[in-house]
Amino acid sequence: MKAAELRKLTAEELKTKLVEQQQELFNLRFRHATAQLENTSSMGDARRTIARIQTILKEKE
């Protein structure tokens, strides 16, 4: 998700998205460990999205 799209969301929506992304990253790590993940770059994408959300949450404080 782009940062501009994330900035339009409220703090509560961002927190919800953050939890969803953290769960997605957990699932990706699990699939990677069990050799079921074909596209490993999706783990990096998830980490970057989490970082974007956390940064925008700090900006809104």
Curated annotation (Swiss-Prot):
The gene is rpmC. GO terms for molecular function: structural constituent of ribosome. InterPro entries: Ribosomal_protein_uL29, Ribosomal_uL29, Ribosomal_uL29_CS, Ribosomal_uL29_sf. It comes from Nitratidesulfovibrio vulgaris (strain ATCC 29579 / DSM 644 / CCUG 34227 / NCIMB 8303 / VKM B-1760 / Hildenborough). HAMAP family: Ribosomal_uL29 (MF_00374). It comes from the Bacteria. NCBIfam families: L29. GO terms for biological process: translation. Keywords: Ribonucleoprotein, Ribosomal protein. PANTHER family: 60S RIBOSOMAL PROTEIN L35/50S RIBOSOMAL PROTEIN L29 (PTHR10916), LARGE RIBOSOMAL SUBUNIT PROTEIN UL29C (PTHR10916:SF0). SUPFAM superfamilies: Ribosomal protein L29 (L29p). The keyword Membrane does not apply. It holds the Pfam family Ribosomal_L29. Belongs to the universal ribosomal protein uL29 family. Coiled coil: none annotated. GO terms for cellular component: cytosolic large ribosomal subunit. This is Large ribosomal subunit protein uL29.
